[in-house]
Amino acid sequence: MLERESNFKARLLAVMRLKISTLEPYHEFAGVLFKTAADPHSPLNPFAHDSAPVRRDSIRLFEGLVRDTKARIPDELRAELPYLLWLYHMGIILFWIHDSSAKSARTYRLIEQTVELLDKLISLASNPLMRPVRKRALKLVSELRDLELAET
């Protein structure tokens, strides 16, 4: 599907739905895994040094999503967007872990709504009036990532 689609919103929606549907068979065990992964010293922690290969693979998926989209994305945001989308997807997974609705309906609804918001925010990011806000936000992301790298 992604090979044929160049619309950012459609691409992100497809990836996020696929991520959750792939995890769905493990939903009953997700809480137990989360307890381990939430430990900052656990090798299963998604931010841990030991998790770097898995994290990089996931970020690469988002790199492809961003690279092959027709959306107008400022260059400095385009460089950071795969990492930001990875963080976003981690938040969605955390929500899904706690979602007790039938067939994770609340999670899918959250994905639909947040992908819509992200698409609009990314469109707004190209506006010259948003440049100072965009620069400030990306500087913060860079600083946080530098701290993360220093700790691993």
Where are these regions (language model features)?
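Acidic/His metal-coordination segments adjacent to aromatic residues that form catalytic metal sites
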Residues: M1-E5, L65-D75
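Hydrophobic alpha-helical connector segments
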Residues: M1-V32, D39, H49-P53
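Short, hydrophobic secondary-structure boundary micro-motifs
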Residues: G31-L33, P74-D75
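Amphipathic alpha-helical packing segments from all-alpha helical-bundle domains
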Residues: L44-K70, A79-G91
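Hydrophobic alpha-helical segments that form the core
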Residues: L77-W96, R109-L117
